Amino acid sequence: MSTSTIRVAIAGVGNCATSLIQGVEYYRNADPSETVPGLMHVKFGDYHVGDIEFVAAFDVDAEKVGIDLADATEASQNCTIKIADVPQTGINVLRGPTLDGLGDHYRATIDESTAEPVDVVQALIDAKADVLVSYLPVGSEEADKFYAQAAIDAGCAFVNALPVFIASDPEWAKKFTDAGIPIVGDDIKSQIGATITHRVLARLFEERGVRVDRTMQLNVGGNMDFKNMLDRNRLESKKVSKTQAVTSNIPDGPLSGKVEDRNVHIGPSDHVQWLDDRKWAYVRLEGTAFGGVPLNLEYKLEVWDSPNSAGIIIDAVRAAKIALDRGIGGPIMPASSYLMKSPPEQLPDDVARERLEAFIIEA
């Protein structure tokens, strides 16, 4: 491990936060000289996974606010698979502001804390946080931007894991650049999820001379993320993010770069409670191949949703800290392009990975 830690604060102690926190324990003593399943980088620059320390957390759920972060990871509606025991942290979950963070389905399911919201900026300063990770529910536009501004005001880097367009918004990007504060965003990809497999296969079609004519991706899951997304009013940015992540990777053809088109349908579809934190994705691509002959591909992907994202966030956090160490402000392009669905700059995945590896070693 390095001689310094990465002091991480979390906004939203749901399943994704749980998998990240447990994952740090699971990989705390991973050998950097070995290829370790589940990690792209045991050491990311000078930082080992075990260098991550959680120093603050914010939530609005009455069952999570005021209790130790370790206990909060297993409280209320959290339902992901357990991969490690988390010792008591000595960090109690703080009451964050609600703003638009609770949709109708959340309000019908959980009790909102009656505690007074804390001063988030001061809490981040007091915790000496290096990086703030936003894990708020989809549709939390106002709340996510509140935490983004809090990160700027507190002088800590920001990792935007949800589909609210901040790093990819020129005005917000300028705010972070002017403040000298790094941001990695927007909307975390999973390690092997529906988005990364769909975009890679769509590009493969085109690179092999097959035109992508139509495609769809239907996702179902049982966690609160999927229940929250039953509210279609909160879903617009998610559909845009997932769709452009796929179509931006198609270099040519009728669907290239399309966000809205009758021949593209990508997005969450339904909530199936007994799936818990599992997600099932059904993907179909229809194309035109040699001689105008149709060629179709259909597949189903089954994953535990939150550990699948934690394997990416664990690198995003370390990329943000490296940028902070180097005094780099604004969107961290190599990390955002490789790790996020809606970065400021969409790149082919192989190119984005090369740039990220170069960033790590300062090439």
UniProtKB/Swiss-Prot annotation:
NAD(+) binds at D68, A127, Y147, S190, D225, K238. GO terms for molecular function: inositol-3-phosphate synthase activity; NAD+ binding. Pathway: Polyol metabolism; myo-inositol biosynthesis; myo-inositol from D-glucose 6-phosphate: step 1/2. Disruption phenotype: Abolishes synthesis of myo-inositol and mycothiol (MSH or AcCys-GlcN-Ins). Increases cellular protein carbonylation in response to reactive oxygen species (ROS). Sensitive to ROS-inducing agents, including cumene hydroperoxide, hydrogen peroxide, menadione, cadmium chloride, nickel sulfate, iodoacetamide, methylglyoxal, and 1-chloro-2,4-dinitrobenzene. Sensitive to the antibiotics ciprofloxacin, streptomycin, vancomycin, neomycin, and rifamycin SV. Leads to a mild growth defect in inositol-less media. It catalyses: D-glucose 6-phosphate = 1D-myo-inositol 3-phosphate. Disulfide bonds: none annotated. Keywords: Isomerase, Lipid biosynthesis, Lipid metabolism, NAD, Phospholipid biosynthesis, Phospholipid metabolism. Its EC number is 5.5.1.4. It comes from the Bacteria. The keyword Lipid biosynthesis applies. It holds the Pfam family Inos-1-P_synth. One of its GO terms (biological process) is inositol phosphate biosynthetic process. Key enzyme in myo-inositol biosynthesis pathway that catalyzes the conversion of glucose 6-phosphate to 1D-myo-inositol 3-phosphate in a NAD-dependent manner. Plays a key role in oxidative stress resistance as its product is the precursor of the protective antioxidant mycothiol (MSH or AcCys-GlcN-Ins). Belongs to the myo-inositol 1-phosphate synthase family. This is Inositol-3-phosphate synthase. It comes from Corynebacterium glutamicum (strain ATCC 13032 / DSM 20300 / JCM 1318 / BCRC 11384 / CCUG 27702 / LMG 3730 / NBRC 12168 / NCIMB 10025 / NRRL B-2784 / 534).
